[in-house]
């Protein structure tokens, strides 16, 4: 499937930002631009893995990773950070392992995706206990790579922007 037909197929489902459309159209000529190639490959992988999944709003799930990656790009994120934005839910929501992420996208992307996944995993009985653990994990993630926190914040920001689709609890 050519990059242009990929865009045509996907545009029926979700609006692709201009920067991503340009990346996909130029995909064949990206061999010399490893940063753009990494971003396009991460998008394609996330798209395949999230195909058929929907958000509570009913929109295709891939709209969320696109929004997260777009936020990261607007903040000046590097290609590794933007790729992690596309892939941040892949380990949590599919059968893909961190090892497969590393094999396909490198150790830096794996570490960011794993860091974001670990920030989401714990459940606690008390609010105080939960808040203390959240701060502890956030500080540990910042000590390792601040980009983990930036990806997680972009994820949360997009989730907050789409809260109207959740049931009030």
What are these regions (language model features)?
Residues 1-169:
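Active-site helical microenvironments for divalent-metal-assisted chemistry
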């Amino acid at each position: 499937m050519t990059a242009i037909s990929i865009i045509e197929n996907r545009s029926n489902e979700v609006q692709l930002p201009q920067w991503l459309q340009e990346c996909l159209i130029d995909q064949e000529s990206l061999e010399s631009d490893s940063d753009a190639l990494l971003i396009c490959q991460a998008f394609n992988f996330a798209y395949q893995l999230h195909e058929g999944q929907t958000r509570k709003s009913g929109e295709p799930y891939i709209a969320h990773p696109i929004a997260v990656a777009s936020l990261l790009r607007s903040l000046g994120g590097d290609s590794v950070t933007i790729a992690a934005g596309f892939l941040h839910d892949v380990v949590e929501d599919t059968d893909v392992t961190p090892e497969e992420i590393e094999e396909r996208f490198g150790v830096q992307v794996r570490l960011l995706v794993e860091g974001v996944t670990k920030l989401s995993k714990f459940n606690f009985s008390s609010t105080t206990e939960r808040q203390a653990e959240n701060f502890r994990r956030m500080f540990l993630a910042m000590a390792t790579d601040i980009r983990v926190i930036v990806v997680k914040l972009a994820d949360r920001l997009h989730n907050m922007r789409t809260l109207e689709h959740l049931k009030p609890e």
